[in-house]
């Protein structure tokens, strides 16, 4: 099992997001501890939940202007 440094991983996640014009609203390690679940707002104003793993955002669920649905999806993905 690969162990990640949570402090530098978080800094890297925010750096990657900033370069893409993404605002991270919340991020939390998934129950497995091997990846992070991210709630964010894209440069187009959409809300999205992503998996952040190995320095990349993946498996996005997009919600046009609906923070409530995105927050519910985030809560489900984190648990």
Feature annotation, model-predicted:
Residues 1-30:
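Negatively charged, low-complexity tracts enriched in Asp/Glu with abundant Ser/Thr
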Residues 22-25, 37, 59, 64:
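Intrinsically disordered, low-complexity, compositionally biased regions/tails
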């Amino acid at each position: 099992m690969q162990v990640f440094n949570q402090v530098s991983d978080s800094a890297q996640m925010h750096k990657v997001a900033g370069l893409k014009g993404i605002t991270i609203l919340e991020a939390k390690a998934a129950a497995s501890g091997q990846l992070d679940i991210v709630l964010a707002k894209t440069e187009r104003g959409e809300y999205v939940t992503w998996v952040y793993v190995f320095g990349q955002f993946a498996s996005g669920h997009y919600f046009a202007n609906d923070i409530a649905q995105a927050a519910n999806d985030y809560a489900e993905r984190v648990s």
